[in-house]
Amino acid sequence: MVKSKLTRFALLIISLVLSISVLAGCGESGSSNTSTSGNSSSGSDAGSSKPVTILNVSYDPTRELYQEYNEAFVKYWKNKTGQDVTVQQSHGGSGSQARTVIDGNEADVVTLALAYDIDSINKNKELINKEWQKRLPDNSTPYTSTIVFLVRKDNPKNIKDWDDLIKPGIQVITPNPKTSGGARWNYLAAWGYALKKNNNDEQKAREFVKALFENVPVLDSGARGSTTTFVERGIGDVLIAWENEAFLSINELGKDKFKIVVPSISILAEPPVSVVDSVVDKKGTREVAEAYLEYLYSDEGQEIAAKNYYRPRNEAIAKKFENQFPKINLFTIDEVFGGWGKAQKEHFDDGGVFDQIYVKK
């Protein structure tokens, strides 16, 4: 049986013969892939031309982004320093990925779905400098995204906005907020909509989100799993999705099968990045790890982000791709929820609002 295009891009099976090899990689959570710049040659990185390997522990829907970006970075680093660098990838639900680092997965860099997940890596001991968000522009968030809806051909349930997701008989697909960063963005986007519609009435927002999750038949652990449930397994009427994941589904499977619905209001999703200080200092990889994240802000890095449907921070690159992204009324987590620390504690920690309103199927 021929696998669908979505299965092929999710598994990232690359057979092109390139000067940059794509090998089988490692990682303790989710799937992995490795990019390398090829044979070692003379050059220097901190006084050494020895090949170096770094591990990027990332969240679910960045697989395609970092597959392309890693190839670009290793070429850039080879040309600049003469040094070969191998980038290994690990992908999964953002919260689960953070926990693997806490448990000893030696990530040189983390590129996760939200700031709280990076902060949580310091739960038991300080692995990352507490001022990590100040080390790179835009609070160490080189690209942004938002939350949209993916519906089936011709939108048979006529889904137009958040209110339609709580109607009787509508099946909504979204991941588990306890394990997935994207799911937490989805949840907060819905909560923020309900607040703004109901004059900041917290009780009405709670009732709205409770009703929404009553329409969720299954909670996958990560965003890519929910996409597979909706697209391949045919479950659900609407997928609440990262914008890039919705675009990717349409481009891989065709506009004749799915349609993106842009809600009247959504949340500005800011997925941050950081080196893991304890690991890079132990392994001696700080220079290349920092350069790896800094290059995300380069023109090439920003173009790669935009081509993979992440909204670039660079204004010139954003202008170039402005017709690709719909205009959406966005609010921030700081404006509505007082930041990730407060939102996590109130809504997603054990015994929080989500645990109170969600009834397991």
Regions found by a protein language model. Give the residues of each.
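Extracellular/periplasmic juxtamembrane helices and adjacent flexible linkers that interface
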Residues: 28, 280-361
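Bacterial N-terminal signal peptides that target proteins for export
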Residues: 2-13
